């Protein structure tokens, strides 16, 4: 189960970093305690059934996320004209006398 959750968190983190947002996922588990033994057995059965349903839903969600996950989305940008990897996406900046990197512009 921990392996399943770590894969789920990895997929969520990769999709979140693609959009430059961070998503924090938390998983909680609860138990119900009753003093009545008859109700306790019924509640334990209900809880185990709910956990089984949730684990099936989690596995389905994980499969859906893995299908959407595409390795090509994380490849670095390659300029089709200059074949430069990870360079500027617009026209050549030195040709137009300015350079912009991470929101900072310098003119020369």
Swiss-Prot record:
InterPro entries, sorted? SDHF4 (IPR012875)
Give the superkingdom in one word: Eukaryota
The Gene Ontology CC terms held by the record are: mitochondrial matrix; mitochondrion
Sorted keywords for this record are:
Chaperone, Mitochondrion
Function of the molecule: Plays an essential role in the assembly of succinate dehydrogenase (SDH), an enzyme complex (also referred to as respiratory complex II) that is a component of both the tricarboxylic acid (TCA) cycle and the mitochondrial electron transport chain, and which couples the oxidation of succinate to fumarate with the reduction of ubiquinone (coenzyme Q) to ubiquinol. Binds to the flavoprotein subunit SdhA in its FAD-bound form, blocking the generation of excess reactive oxygen species (ROS) and facilitating its assembly with the iron-sulfur protein subunit SdhB into the SDH catalytic dimer.
Coiled-coil intervals in this record? none
Provide ranges: composition bias, Basic and acidic residues: 95-108
Biased-composition ranges, Low complexity, are 33-46
Q: Which GO terms describe its biological process?
A: mitochondrial respiratory chain complex II assembly
Q: Where in the cell is it found?
A: Mitochondrion matrix
Q: Which family does it belong to?
A: Belongs to the SDHAF4 family.
Which is a Pfam family this sequence falls into? DUF1674
Disordered: where is this region? 33-59, 79-108
Please describe the quaternary structure of this protein. Interacts with SdhA in its FAD-bound form.
State the species of origin: Dictyostelium discoideum
User: What name is this protein filed under?
Assistant: Succinate dehydrogenase assembly factor 4, mitochondrial
